[in-house]
Amino acid sequence: MKKSVKRMIGGICALSMLTGTLSACGKSNADPDMPEEPVVDVSTELQETEPQKDFPETYEIPVGSYAYDPEEIMFLSGVTACGMQKDMFFSMKDLDGDMISELFVMKKSGDGDEIAVYSYDNTQNKAVLTKDAVYDINELVWAGGDQWIDSTVLGAAGILGNPGVKEDFYLSVNYDFLADTHINTQGDEFNELDMKNMIEEQKLSMINERDKYQGKDIQILRDYQDVANDWDRRSADGIEPVKKYLEDAANINSISELDKFLADTGRNPFCRFFNPVITLDEEDTSEWILELDEDATFSVLPRIFHNSDTEDIKEIRADYEIAATHILTRAGLTEEEVAKMIEESYVLEDALLEAAWPNEESDNPVGAIPVDEVCASCSNFPLEAVLNGLGVNKGKLNIIYPDYLPVLDEMYTEENLSCFRSYIMTHIAYMSYEYLDLEAGKCLMSADETDEEYKEYVKDRTYTEIMGSRGILGVAEENAYMTYYVDPKAKETLTMICEDTAEAFAAMIKEEEWLSEEGKAAALEKLNKMKFCVLSPDELIDSSYLAIDTSDSFYDIYVKLRVSNLKHNCAATGEKRVPGEWRYDLRPEIATSVDNAYYNGSLNQFFVLAGFISDFTFSDDMPYEEMLAKMGSIIGHELTHGFDPNGIQYDADGNKVATDDKPYGWMPEADYNAYMEKAEKVSAYFDKVVGVPYMACSGEQQWGEASADIAGVSIAMKIAQDHPGFDYDCYFRSRAELWREQMSFIRESGYITDAHPFNYLRVNAVNAQFDEFVQTYGLSEDNRMYIPPEERITIW
């Protein structure tokens, strides 16, 4: 029996079909220097032969508490087969459709190849070759040979051994870490960058240690926590706090009365029929604008409404109906009356949901429009009065869905008054049930859940609310955190690293041969205007607008906080944006307790947030080289994103200047073309990399992040020139430690589509681009870590 064989990379001149077994717990070791066998010339066909003795029958895979799955057994066996030996390759591909890959091990032999094919046998937990297992091998991608093996996969390091820094720098530097076990299941991953976050523990201490931590901001958080968990008082209040809002809405008998109700935040804390969000116009970031989104209190999200069938939508709305019915019947309505109100509310809500969706006009937005122009476009709906009630009487508005406001305006008539009233009352009820008494809060809980279990749930939820930067107490929480935990010395040191990075990059820009004088001037203008926001602003935002009156009910406290936040944010509409201003009140994603360090093009600001900092990424005890390798690498990486094809769309003031006709923004076209020519080399390099067996990396997808990694090291090498005695070994080893991680095979293979290269490539493929690395470790052409100068891929 002869079978046709096709390969993606190179033709198979000679193959020998081999039989053998490998075991997850066998005790035999592969010979690292396999002797070559005589070549059996079968051209491009695969034939059955007797097993060859140089391919071991079993491969030993360490066994521990972690249970390897079939795919991992195949992968780790392939690692053993090819090891760090040249001319050995392996691949995995599911040929028979059983969702378990077959393992192909190929060895160069003379002018041809010898190949062993193993299949997994679940009865033995072994990979066993059957002679007729291979029917068609299409587009196989072979790993191994001169490429590094992905040693982040659990078990790979132990099998490969420590190859030395000249052969696999990532594996060698991190060998002890990688050879240990840090994950417990096949869905796990362990990354010290992700494990660094101490923020939650710090915030818990801040809340709970009342004698140690005191002040205005922390008191706001504790007042909210105490009232939220005072169940005696909440039970005594019952649903009385919400009844005044329901009764007020029930007495609306005309559109003119509805106008007044909607404009008064004291009477109407919930329903405006749109959600105002403070933001910036990407084409003119000089002032804050207001974005009008769809109503945030809808019973179902627009994307679900537009992509689900009627039964699914009905099921999703069940919770809304249960909660609304519970509150409204306790307020004195009958179930029949509530059912009618819900039905009427859906008439209005469905019409608005239909309009809350992109159309051709939203694909080509007109940009921000002056407030008075938008208000004038409404013939019926009192948009101007509602906005004035929120403190908005100047500036510009951005409409997300072009059809939404016209539909709302068209429906706002006396004829539909009952629908509007029903919508308001049912939505008030639904938005309130969690902030009243125990009976209301449990209305959506299972019948067997005890009161104590629900109270514990509320306690946990309250902690989440008061410890989150995006919650209604976010500003007070961030102020308290920065007051107690941001170290001024750390801020000073990290600011110095940012300044060193910017200074070095400026020097590189001036020296770049591919940049024209015009391009250099534009790049330097943007870099010089870039503001670095490190750990905390010099002045905290006043949180007085969040002050709590503890004599109020918990419900009233929640309602007042909700309105105070809304009015505080909306009041910024039309205000000039101050370059470098750190508005964590308006943009919670830049709150310092967020786990991030990144460049924001619309603000032309670089943020190093405290949530990203830990003893692993930064401490004052680190040598400067280690600081530069860890936080410096990240800062340099992110900074250069401001000058990549996405970053060049935004000018020095954060305005988007790129157009369809001029996608290169502020960069001269010739410079952009030169940049992309260099980028194509980066892309081509990663196209050749086989990250995991049978799945090659995508250079087109990963070149941007890879280029930023390389640029970060380029900047560090520039900085090193000004530091006599710079310890390059410390720098490169520290950078390898930064990216060390451990993955299950299935978890790692899932990252093949990520825009970032695998972590072992972020070390090996990046370090190998630099003369300083070659010289530090005495690399030559015989070492895997050596890349000839003419093949190196740097942009900056």
Q: Where is each model-derived feature located?
A:
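Acidic/hydrophobic-patterned starts of short beta strands in beta-sheet-rich repeat architectures
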Residues: 97-107, 147-151
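Sec-dependent N-terminal signal peptides of Gram-positive bacterial secreted proteins and lipoproteins
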Residues: 4-28
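Noncatalytic, helix-rich "gating/capping" subdomain that lines the substrate-entry/channel surface
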Residues: 201-501, 537
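Acidic, divalent-cation-chelating loop motifs in proteins
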Residues: 90-98
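Sec-dependent signal peptide cleavage junction
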Residues: 19-39, 43
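Short aromatic loop motif centered on NTY/YTY
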Residues: 126-152, 157, 164
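Structural motif
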Residues: 111-117
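Intrinsically disordered, low-complexity linker/terminal regions across diverse proteins
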Residues: 474, 479-796
